[in-house]
Amino acid sequence: MLYQLLHTVLSVVGVSLNAFMMYLALTKSPKIMLPCSAIITIKTFTDILTSAMSFFVMQRIVTDGSSILVIPTGPCTHLGPTACYIGHMFMLCFLECNLIWMISSYIFRYYILYVRDPSIKSLVFVAICLSIPSFIHMATWISNYDPTVAIAIPENVGIESRDMVLGGTIVTWSALTLIIQLFITSILVLIAYAWIRNTLLSFAVKMGSDKNDVKKLNTRLVKVINFQVFLPSFIFLGVFVFVGMFTQLIDPKISQYLVSVIFMFSPICSPFSYILFVPHYLNVILGNKKVSEAKSTTEGCTFRHVNMAASTSNTPECSA
């Protein structure tokens, strides 16, 4: 019961924070920031879906090294094991799409910096194209899932007779595959972060001392990505707990509750990278309307008169 309450609180907080951030991006962003607001909207949308699936399944992941079992405790249990397995796959898939979009947003930042602003349609199109492989992969596993397969439940792992248990070859290999993919994608996020951070710092040096507005905007953006680089750390921590359980270094009676909970902190913390380090959104929240409008005007002037450097005036909020 306590575990379900914790999952409910985390899911509600995740949905609420990201819905609020999406509202700010859609309704409170200046027109010069439209591409950036689209990038934020897509990111927060995947975070909302991740949080919703976490509530729907409220899963525990158990392994003794020979098999992987998923124990759902959420509303999906009223719909049957197939619905719970679908929810389990969707949650892991949305987590992966979230990481992939972070990498893509770094690439878009570079594109905005040195080429031009992408259109909203192109951003949405890219987001859809990037999600297709993950959903095809997920659909393949779901189509092969058999809820009637016999499950061997290991002893002394804290599973009770009343628990719904998802297991079998498909559950084991699908969960293992997606967790490995999350780990690899998180590493790619760190590599992309190092690349775009060096790019932004190099660009700031090239600007010179006479373009302070642009350099300030770049500084804000670096702060955003410095905060966001900690988001994959929750994925790493969850994977490490799973590996400890898989190798029997950690007692599964406790660690089975940790993996999904740790994963949930990534979508919960994500909106704070914009709220804390993007002055425009922070001023809106604090009610400093005049300050917010003044900063937007300054950014607009920078955008119109600094040529290539002006592209960065669109980038302070271009963060996944």
Curated annotation (Swiss-Prot):
Membrane-crossing residue ranges in chain numbering: 5-25, 38-58, 83-103, 122-142, 176-196, 230-250, 258-278
Keyword flag Transmembrane helix: yes
GO CC list: membrane
A biological process from GO: short-term memory
Keywords recorded for this protein, A-Z: Membrane, Transmembrane, Transmembrane helix
Record's subcellular location: Membrane
Protein topology in the membrane: Multi-pass membrane protein
SUPFAM superfamilies in the cross-refs: Family A G protein-coupled receptor-like
Domain of life: Eukaryota
Record-stated family: Belongs to the nematode receptor-like protein srd family.
Protein name as annotated: Serpentine receptor class delta-28
Organism: Caenorhabditis elegans
Gene assigned in the entry: srd-28
